[in-house]
Amino acid sequence: MTCLFFVLSCTDNEGTLEKRLAVRPQHIERLQKLDDEGRLVVAGAMPKDPNDPQAGFYGSTMIVEFDTREALDEWLKEEPFLKEGIYSHVDVKPFNKAFPKG
């Protein structure tokens, strides 16, 4: 079966910085597991001001690899930032990886 890549554009709710920081360890743990499995291409937060961490975040972007969209949806159901109301929504789009090769 060919694995599929997806871009996740995650938007934060306003006023969730403290909660985001509190829940971050669980979020990072799940991303580390994906990375250990070789299914995480890239992940990171989008700061409102890169020079001021207290300004908060617009959200996060991830590129992940799953066997099916359904498998990704199941994984997302357990995403701590979604479950705890940090993300207002996650936009999922298929992605055709061209570079880097391999």
What positions do the PLM features span?
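Conserved, structured core segments of small domains
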Residues: M1-G102
